[in-house]
């Protein structure tokens, strides 16, 4: 609306300056020519048409001035294709226990959006039965201070730590999983035959939709986050002789 306002003001000023002023600061002549009014009206109509017909941006969010406080249209979060079970917008830190309730992002008291089942999230997963062990040990946490990330094109982008929705500040959390130790045992991964295999644990990644900024415009982008810990195997070279 700010661009439309400035456009209308500019058109109005051009229309005024097009007519000469007398010393008494009164427009000279009896009336403004009809052709001039027609041209001015046409300019206003064109500006209004462009404002209404302009394609909607990916999301209705802009940076106000030089601040980092970004206001987001709550309808944005109703697009299910943008949801990810590893991304959460919340006004408070999410619980990390196995009996945690589902975390929803509610706007205006209406039906919740960004609904995902996170009750299974825990920092010590998975749960094994007696005698069972994980090849690699992993740890999972909700990350709330992510400021930069690598997008799907390999470029570094700025991640929005928080957004303003209906005058409420929501933090953007990422549920990340990584290896606790690259070598849970001296030989590498647990349970691997070290006589024939070299092994080590490594963190793997996936891409999730997250709110980022570029040129003072907020937008959804795929960014890379840590999501699992796996064991990498290399066969040992056979000894000759």
Swiss-Prot record:
<keyword id="KW-0732">Signal</keyword>
<feature type="glycosylation site" description="N-linked (GlcNAc...) asparagine">
    <location>
        <position position="114"/>
    </location>
</feature>
<keyword id="KW-0964">Secreted</keyword>
<feature type="disulfide bond">
    <location>
        <begin position="179"/>
        <end position="229"/>
    </location>
</feature>
<feature type="disulfide bond">
    <location>
        <begin position="136"/>
        <end position="201"/>
    </location>
</feature>
<feature type="signal peptide">
    <location>
        <begin position="1"/>
        <end position="18"/>
    </location>
</feature>
<dbReference type="GO" id="GO:0008191">
    <property type="term" value="F:metalloendopeptidase inhibitor activity"/>
</dbReference>
<keyword id="KW-0481">Metalloenzyme inhibitor</keyword>
<keyword id="KW-0325">Glycoprotein</keyword>
<dbReference type="GO" id="GO:0005615">
    <property type="term" value="C:extracellular space"/>
</dbReference>
<dbReference type="InterPro" id="IPR002072">
    <property type="entry name" value="Nerve_growth_factor-rel"/>
</dbReference>
<dbReference type="GO" id="GO:0005163">
    <property type="term" value="F:nerve growth factor receptor binding"/>
</dbReference>
<keyword id="KW-0339">Growth factor</keyword>
<dbReference type="GO" id="GO:0043524">
    <property type="term" value="P:negative regulation of neuron apoptotic process"/>
</dbReference>
<feature type="glycosylation site" description="N-linked (GlcNAc...) asparagine">
    <location>
        <position position="69"/>
    </location>
</feature>
<dbReference type="GO" id="GO:0030425">
    <property type="term" value="C:dendrite"/>
</dbReference>
<dbReference type="InterPro" id="IPR020437">
    <property type="entry name" value="Nerve_growth_factor_bsu_mml"/>
</dbReference>
<keyword id="KW-1015">Disulfide bond</keyword>
<dbReference type="GO" id="GO:0050804">
    <property type="term" value="P:modulation of chemical synaptic transmission"/>
</dbReference>
<dbReference type="GO" id="GO:0007169">
    <property type="term" value="P:cell surface receptor protein tyrosine kinase signaling pathway"/>
</dbReference>
<feature type="disulfide bond">
    <location>
        <begin position="189"/>
        <end position="231"/>
    </location>
</feature>
<keyword id="KW-0646">Protease inhibitor</keyword>
<comment type="similarity">
    <text>Belongs to the NGF-beta family.</text>
</comment>
<dbReference type="GO" id="GO:0038180">
    <property type="term" value="P:nerve growth factor signaling pathway"/>
</dbReference>
<protein>
    <recommendedName>
        <fullName>Beta-nerve growth factor</fullName>
    </recommendedName>
</protein>
<keyword id="KW-0967">Endosome</keyword>
<keyword id="KW-0483">Metalloprotease inhibitor</keyword>
<dbReference type="GO" id="GO:0048812">
    <property type="term" value="P:neuron projection morphogenesis"/>
</dbReference>
<dbReference type="GO" id="GO:0021675">
    <property type="term" value="P:nerve development"/>
</dbReference>
<dbReference type="InterPro" id="IPR019846">
    <property type="entry name" value="Nerve_growth_factor_CS"/>
</dbReference>
<comment type="function">
    <text>Nerve growth factor is important for the development and maintenance of the sympathetic and sensory nervous systems. Extracellular ligand for the NTRK1 and NGFR receptors, activates cellular signaling cascades through those receptor tyrosine kinase to regulate neuronal proliferation, differentiation and survival. Inhibits metalloproteinase dependent proteolysis of platelet glycoprotein VI.</text>
</comment>
<dbReference type="InterPro" id="IPR020425">
    <property type="entry name" value="Nerve_growth_factor_bsu"/>
</dbReference>
<dbReference type="GO" id="GO:0008083">
    <property type="term" value="F:growth factor activity"/>
</dbReference>
<dbReference type="InterPro" id="IPR020408">
    <property type="entry name" value="Nerve_growth_factor-like"/>
</dbReference>
<keyword id="KW-0165">Cleavage on pair of basic residues</keyword>
<dbReference type="GO" id="GO:0030424">
    <property type="term" value="C:axon"/>
</dbReference>
<dbReference type="InterPro" id="IPR029034">
    <property type="entry name" value="Cystine-knot_cytokine"/>
</dbReference>
<feature type="propeptide">
    <location>
        <begin position="19"/>
        <end position="121"/>
    </location>
</feature>
<dbReference type="GO" id="GO:0008021">
    <property type="term" value="C:synaptic vesicle"/>
</dbReference>
<dbReference type="Pfam" id="PF00243">
    <property type="entry name" value="NGF"/>
</dbReference>
<comment type="subunit">
    <text>Homodimer. The homodimer interacts with a single NTRK1 chain. The homodimer interacts with a single NGFR chain. The NGF dimer interacts with a single SORCS2 chain (via extracellular domain). The NGF precursor (proNGF) binds to a receptor complex formed by SORT1 and NGFR, which leads to NGF endocytosis. Both mature NGF and the immature NGF precursor (proNGF) interact with SORCS2 and with the heterodimer formed by SORCS2 and NGFR (via extracellular domains). The NGF precursor (proNGF) has much higher affinity for SORCS2 than mature NGF.</text>
</comment>
